[in-house]
């Protein structure tokens, strides 16, 4: 049981590190993720975008 909990915590930490390293934050204000897509395509060349806390986040 302790080993499985340790493995789950390790996977969680690794996945958070991967997402943090890959994301790029834009200063654009947004209300939904579809508003971020044109900006991410123009600046970074990627369509993977999310609007979190009224900021655009672009992912590779």
Curated annotation (Swiss-Prot):
Record-marked site positions (Aromatic residue of the functional dyad): 59
Disulfide bonds: 30-51, 36-56, 40-58
TM spans (from-to): none
Keywords, ordered alphabetically: Disulfide bond, Ion channel impairing toxin, Neurotoxin, Potassium channel impairing toxin, Secreted, Signal, Toxin, Voltage-gated potassium channel impairing toxin
GO MF annotations, alphabetized: ion channel inhibitor activity; potassium channel regulator activity; toxin activity
Positions bearing the site annotation: Basic residue of the functional dyad: 50
InterPro entries: Scorpion_toxin-like_sf (IPR036574), Scorpion_toxinS_K_inh (IPR001947)
Gene3D superfamilies to which the protein is assigned, alphabetical: Knottin, scorpion toxin-like
First and last residue of the signal peptide: 1-22
Tissue expression pattern: Expressed by the venom gland.
Any single Gene Ontology cellular-component annotation: extracellular region
Localization, UniProt: Secreted
Family matches, as SUPFAM superfamilies: Scorpion toxin-like
Purpose: Weakly inhibits Kv11.1/KCNH2/ERG1, Kv1.2/KCNA2 and Kv1.3/KCNA3 voltage-gated potassium channels.
Family the UniProt entry places it in: Belongs to the short scorpion toxin superfamily. Potassium channel inhibitor family.
Name of the protein described by the UniProt record: Potassium channel toxin-like Tx677
Natural source organism: Buthus israelis (Israeli scorpion)
